[in-house]
Amino acid sequence: MAGKVKWVTDIEKSVLINNFEKRGWVQVTENEDWNFYWMSVQTIRNVFSVEAGYRLSDDQIVNHFPNHYELTRKDLMVKNIKRYRKELEKEGSPLAEKDENGKYLYLDFVPVTYMLPADYNLFVEEFRKSPSSTWIMKPCGKAQGKGIFLINKLSQIKKWSRDSKTSSFVSQSNKEAYVISLYINNPLLIGGRKFDLRLYVLVSTYRPLRCYMYKLGFCRFCTVKYTPSTSELDNMFVHLTNVAIQKHGEDYNHIHGGKWTVSNLRLYLESTRGKEVTSKLFDEIHWIIVQSLKAVAPVMNNDKHCFECYGYDIIIDDKLKPWLIEVNASPSLTSSTANDRILKYNLINDTLNIAVPNGEIPDCKWNKSPPKEVLGNYEILYDEELAQGDGADRELRSRQGQSLGPRAGRSRDSGRAVLTTWK
């Protein structure tokens, strides 16, 4: 009989530990021989640092890629997507097609974004083109809505820059980088409230790219009705959907936690907008997720000991266009409601079934192609090997989320095009 998997974690969450114990795995310390380490992003940095000089053996796997930040840091994600667009343009790919105003027809899925302080002059130029716009500033390396604020005047950003420079604890050399993005001020509202989507995406390998979408994502709602009014720019209960912020609101509901399941959203949209339009929206969401992964795949350290479950944040505007806002390397495993706890327990269970075949001691040399029976609530979102195989187009087109891309005779209202191939 094979030995038991030895596990370590530095994240004390019951949804993790219960899953390990259910499998009969054995807990050890990080200084002992371990097979599976569910670690924080800080720890992964140390494990793969040159100074650590640590080499993982074939029977060890971890839950982050070494340079996951190429996707999960807001500034690097945007940089990689911009590079990806340029490369496709250079290749003459139809995906990089632009309209008469120079806007990408298909790859325009991230709001206009600049890095600060590096791109300050470029930002000012853009700001002056549409001075009535609202922009959202976010620190590159923080999560849960920390350090975010909205601006609609250049004087506000000048004040921020001045305050940052004169701050006694922030030197100019290591001043925290921010991104500033055009704020989506026409979000789709339900019950007058803004919401976003949190979707879970598992990547088992980047080269070839193989990723899975979790079917049980959810919507996070603001507790206060949305208004684009400048008087409410500082009210984060109106603008930010993060549970870490909304749970402090007077109207926060501790029973449902201000959340809807994705399937409820789908039913709502089918009844209010129609089935075809709703299917097109979800196809497009799936498509932009795959494009974001393709954008970072060339620069990602595709270490065979790694897999990663990302939390994708998507906002839908009132024209039913989805926007990729950010990607989280460590989506929260804290449970805000009973349903939340069940969802996250099942998410970890299904993730482990794919990452650790049969719950046996890992062998990082396996082909990372689990049988369909173990996918649970995951479904294959994209499989590069399959996409490049003979007859793959027909196979892929028959799957949910695999049908976006250029086509003849599109119109702006009929949806932003349907792809005939994923190659």
Curated annotation (Swiss-Prot):
Entry EC no(s): 6.3.2.-
InterPro entries (UniProt xref): TTL/TTLL_fam
GO biological process entries: cerebellar Purkinje cell differentiation; immune response in nasopharyngeal-associated lymphoid tissue; microtubule cytoskeleton organization; mucociliary clearance; protein polyglutamylation; regulation of blastocyst development; sperm axoneme assembly
Gene Ontology MF term list: ATP binding; metal ion binding; protein-glutamic acid ligase activity, elongating; tubulin binding; tubulin-glutamic acid ligase activity
Pfam families in the cross-refs: TTL (PF03133)
UniProt main location, coarse: cytoplasm
Keyword flag Magnesium: yes
Binding site for Mg(2+) 1: 313, 326
KW Transferase (keyword) present: no
Cofactor(s) needed by this chain: Mg(2+)
Annotated residues for binding of Mg(2+) 2: 326, 328
Site annotation Essential for specifying alpha-elongation versus initiation step of the polyglutamylase activity: residues: 144
Highest rank taxon of the organism: Eukaryota
Family: Belongs to the tubulin polyglutamylase family.
Description of how the protein assembles with itself and partners: Part of the neuronal tubulin polyglutamylase complex which contains TPGS1, TPGS2, TTLL1, LRRC49 and NICN1. Interacts with PCM1, CSTPP1 and LRRC49.
Domain comment quoted from the record: Gln-144 is the main determinant for regioselectivity, which segregates between initiases and elongases in all tubulin--tyrosine ligase family. A glutamine residue at this position is found in elongases TTLL6, TTLL9, TTLL11, TTLL13, TTLL10 and favors glutamate-chain elongation, whereas an arginine residue is found in initiases TTLL2, TTLL4, TTLL5, TTLL3, TTLL8 and favors initiation.
The protein's name: Polyglutamylase complex subunit TTLL1
Gene name as annotated: TTLL1
